[in-house]
Each structure stands twice: as C-alpha cells, then as structure tokens.
Amino acid sequence: MSNYKTVFFTLGILQIILGIFMLIPIFVQFFFNEIDSSFFGASIITIIFGTLFFLSNLDHDKKLNLQQAFLLTALSWLSIAIFGSLPLIFSEVNFSFTNAFFESMSGITTTGSTIIPNLEEMPKAILLWRAILQWLGGIGIIVMAITLMPIMNVGGMQLFKISNSDSSEKILPKSKEIALRLIYIYSGLTALCAMSYKILGMNTFDSITHSMTTIATGGFSNYNESIGFFDSVYIEISAMIFIILGSLPFIAYIKFLNGNRRIFFSDIQIRTFLKIILISILILSIYLFLDKSSELNFRTVLFNVISILTGTGYVNAQFDNWGGFPLIIFIGLMFIGGCAGSTTCGIKIFRFQILYSFVLNQLRKIIYPKGIFVLKYNQSPVDDKFTASIISFIYMYLVIFFAITALLSLTGLDFITSISGAATSISNVGPGLGSTIGPNGNFYQLPDVSKWILSTGMILGRLELFAILVLFLPSFWRS
C-alpha cells in the first residue's frame, strides 16, 4: 500500500474539505429553524476519516505517477459521493442509502437527476447541500480536466496539455497556481450570477443556490418546475448567459487575463460551440414556424437548447410534448456536450471536430491516393495517436450508452425511459424523457438497481470513461 500513500493522503485532504463544507448548511438550519444533527454528525464523521487518511500517510511521495493519478481520480469522486450522501441519510427525511447515494452522485457529477419528488417540501439545508455538491463537482472537474486529464492521455485530452500553449502567448503558470486562479474565476462568476438572480427577483436563498448550480452547469433547482417556477424571461436570460460562461474552457479565462484578448474569438472550440447553439435554435425555430400545432415558442427553444447542450438540465417547459423531431435534436445535443476544460459534459465538441477532420481527410485520400493531408486542430498538427484515442473514446461512449440502455430495460423500464435515462446519465444532463423521468419528473419511482446503473453511468461519463475503465485492466495493477 506504500505505493498509494500519495493517493490516500490527497483523499484525506479532500474529505476534510468536504467535511468543512458540510458545516455551512448548519447556519441555514439555524436561520430557518430546521435544526437537527444530520449535517454536524456527517461533518464529524467525514473529517475524522479524512484526518485518519491524512495523518497515516504523511510520509507520502510528493510526486504523483500515472497509475496513482488514475486511482486518485476515481476514488475522489466515489468517496465524495459516498460521504456526501451522509447528511441525506442522517436527515429527518430518511433517505435510503441508494437514494442518498444517487442524489449525491448526481450532484458531484453535475448531472442534476433527482430522486426527490417534492422539492418544495425539502429542508433548506438539504437544498443548499445539493447545490454545494454541484458547485464542488463543477470546480473539481475543471481543475481535473486542465491539470490531470491531459497527463493521463484520456480520450484525446492530451491535446490540452498546459505546456502546449501557443508560443506567442506567455508561459502559463504552474498547475497549483492555475488551480487557484480557476477557483477565483469560478467563484467570481458564481457571485456575479447570484447578484444577477437577486436583482431580477429571486430571494436570497434561491439566488445563492441557483447561482451555484448554474455556473456548475448542474441544474439542481429548489422547485419541481426547475427554473420555470420563476416564470421570468429575465431570470432565464441571466441563466443562459451564465450557463454559457460556465460552458467555455476556463483556461481561456486565464489566457484572457494573461493578455490574449482575442482568445474567445480565436479558439475553434468556442466558435463551434456557439455555432451549434445558433444552428440548433435556427432549425427548431423553422420547425416552430412550419408546425403551427407545436407547443414550442422561441423562448423555450432558446433556453432548452442551451440547457441541454451544456448538460445543465434546467427546464422551463415540458419538452416531452414537443413532438418527435425536437426530441431527436435534444438527444443529439445531449451527446455533443460542451467545451473541454469547462463544467459541461458529453462527448465534447473538440472530439467531434477532430473526428470530422479525420473523416474529411479519409475522403480526400480516396480522391487523391498519393496526397498528404495533415490533420490540424486550432492551427496545430494532430498526431495519429490522438486521433485514435478520440475515435476509441467515441466508440466506447456509444457502447456504454447501449449497454446502460439494455441493462435498464432488463430492470423493467420502458424503452423511452431506458434510452433517455442512459443518455442523460452518461452525458450528465439531468432530465430524461417520458412520464417518469421527463423534464418535470424525477427518478424516485425507479427500482433501486436502476438507480445504481444510472449512478455508474454518471461517474463513467463525468470522468471521461477511460479514467474508470482502465482500473479494471489487470495490467494496470501490474504496471
């Protein structure tokens, strides 16, 4: 176990931090006179376990090798989901372990699926804790995507190694400094979002919790009707702006602050992300114009395209009733996802860009067999091994999606619930389709085994598949 001292030392720190965050809802309990011992007890247990891990591994190696990085990534999310479920289990609401773990995993992976049937009846402390989990999950995935994933060579993420920044730019600071700057930017955007919500009519509690789940593109709300509860076009506009800000690569914010004022216009991933939003809105608007019987309107089209593409999962309408064509568009948007290095999920735009260029080059080679075609991304050549990694990722993404769909159907779920549940879990979106898990539904009525399958899909999708799958290879443990 000495090889893994660094892993458990870091896990100890993360658990102590999580335990400290558990103390925050206690102040809300006092304010709303909902006092119980659930959060205090959960905090003490979490901090004790974290302290034991921390103190028993003080002699750890200061460096983290590749094997340890994979193990730390998987155990971090799993342990936070487990300990994050404790306040729910200890609460007077009496969550079962399955339901509490599902809600916690949905929170920390910023999925946004919920097993709570009546959110309005929940204690404020639990609503705040759900928001905190999503907020922590959002910043956690940003830091991991920028500092760990490129080193781990997962699904083409090595394209975003910090050392590969453009030579015309200043050399970026080291990983620790980058992580701190990311936290400052993330916190600043959250504060701005909260202020905008407050100004536009939300009460203080709602503005704080919704700002946390907006920037994290998580989608947890305090109401069954989600953001539609407020029935405010101005709140929805504010939400869309901050969802988009949370969906951009956070390294771009650092580059912007370092002096690259054109980064948001020059980055091909950002440009494509915005084009997908505009094209999707245009297609659905044309459909809206031609199909007079549709319940669509431009406001709901605009909001739900942005919400679904980014994996946020906020809804302002029951999009189950919009007909088959819009639902096909939305399922496609679920798979596409947002930008790498942001809080969003899905396959990610850069992978589709490279896959498109790869297919285009293959077609050119058919026409010009002797031609030499170099695949490029953001004006830089892309090595064949990166392309192979991306193709492998997309292949496994689809395989796991169909596997989850099949497993869910074996638990007795209907086809629509199974296929949309698989899509929303692996893409970390939140709502599915159908009368049970649709936009204003929840996952409470699903069998426990279905919830465990979906929870597995959530962590697989959040951690880019291979960061989990590699742990099941015997050769990984022998390396």
Residue ranges and their predicted role:
Residues 1-479:
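Membrane-proximal intracellular helices of multi-pass ion channels
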